[in-house]
Amino acid sequence: MISTKAEVLNNKQADKKAVKCVVWDLDNTLWDGVLLEDDRIFLRNEVVEIIKRLDSRGILQSIASKNYAAKAMAQLQEFDLDEYFLYPQINWNSKSSSIQEIAHALNLGVDTFAFIDDQLFELEEVNFSLPQVLCINAAELGHLLDMPEMNPRFITEDSKLRRLMYISDIVRNNSEKKFVGTQEEFLATLNMTFTISSAQEEDLQRAEELTLRTNQLNTTAYTYSYDELNHFRQSDQHKLLIASLDDKYGSYGKIGLVLVECQESAWTIKLLLMSCRVMSRGVGTIMLNYIMTLAKNNNVRLRSEFIANDRNRMMYVSYKFAGFKEIDKTIFLETDLMIIQPVPSYIKFQTRI
C-alpha cells in the first residue's frame, strides 16, 4: 500500500540511483494554489532555495504539469524561475508520458529521474508506469535537499554549469533544425575543437563523476573513486586521459574519459566513456582512434574490456567499426590496428599529453 505521506511509494523506491533530473508539478507543489482557478498564487517558501541548490549541484530540472502552457510559463517568468526548467511539459498528457518526453529530450535514462507532485494519484500513475523514477510527495519537500540521491559526492565546475551547457545544446539543436544541408555540413559550421589531455589532479572529481553518471556510451560501467583515479594518473603502468569539446556556442565541458593499462607488449582499455550529450556530434570514436594510434606507434597489441548491458550497444558497434573482434567469447575485444579512422574533417583535434 502506498503511504499517504509518501516517505517511499513502495519498496522499489527505497534504493534509487543518484538523481540527474528533478521533474516538478506546478499547482500546489511548486506554488500554492491552482493556476486556472485562483486569482493569485504564491511560491512556496522553500521552493526557490531548493531549485537554486539543486541547480548548483548539477541536477537538472523540468516540469510535468497539467495546465495551459502559455499561462504557466508566464507565471514562471513572473517568478524569475523559467530559466531553470529544461524541456518543460505543460499539457494534458499523463505525467509518466511527460517524464518520458523530458528524458528523451535530455538523453537521460528515467532511472535517474525524480518526480515531485502533491497528488497521490499522479505519484501512483508515475510509479506504476515508470517504477525506476523516484517519486516524492510535495509534502516532503523540506527533506529533499538532504536525500542521498540529491547529494552528489563532488560538485565540479562542470556540475555548476550543466544547465547552461544544456541550454547551449538547445540553441545548437534549434540551429540544426533550421539548417538546410547534410548533418556533416551542419557540424562543419560549429567549429568544434576536441582536446585530449592527460588527466590532472584538478580533473579527478569530474572524472569520477563521469564514471558514475555515464551509462550509454560506456564500455564497462566500471566506477572508480577519486583515490583510484589519482593512483592511475600517477602510475607508469596506466594512461588516464580526459577529453573536452568546445564549439562556437561554448564549451561542452569534460565529456570523455579513457583508462588504459599498459604492459610491455600489450595495452588494455579498462574503461572508455563519452558523455551522451555529445552523441550526435560525431566525436564518439576520436578517443578510441587516438588510443589505437598510440598503441600502433608503441608497437604493442591493443585489446579492450567490454561488458555489454542494455544501454551500451552503441559502444559495441563503435568497437566493431574500429576493427575490434571478440577473443574466445570473453569480455575482451582485440584489434590488429590495420585500419585506424581519421578524425572527421569538421573537427579540430589537439592533444595536451
Where in the sequence are the language-model features?
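Substrate-recognition element of Asp-dependent hydrolases with the DxDx(T/V) motif
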Residues: 47-77, 88-93, 206, 220-224, ...
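Conserved Lys-Pro-Asp/Glu-containing loop-to-beta segment of HAD-superfamily phosphomonoesterases
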Residues: 99-120, 126
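Short amphipathic alpha-helix that is part of the acyltransferase structural core
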Residues: 192-223
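Non-catalytic pre-domain segments flanking phosphatase-related domains
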Residues: 1-26
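Basic, amphipathic juxtamembrane/active-site segments
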Residues: 34-53, 131-138
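Acyl-donor binding region in acyl/amide transferases
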Residues: 245, 254-326
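Conserved beta-hairpin
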Residues: 222, 227-264
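Terminal substrate-recognition subdomain of acyl/acetyltransferases
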Residues: 105, 127, 133-190, 293-353
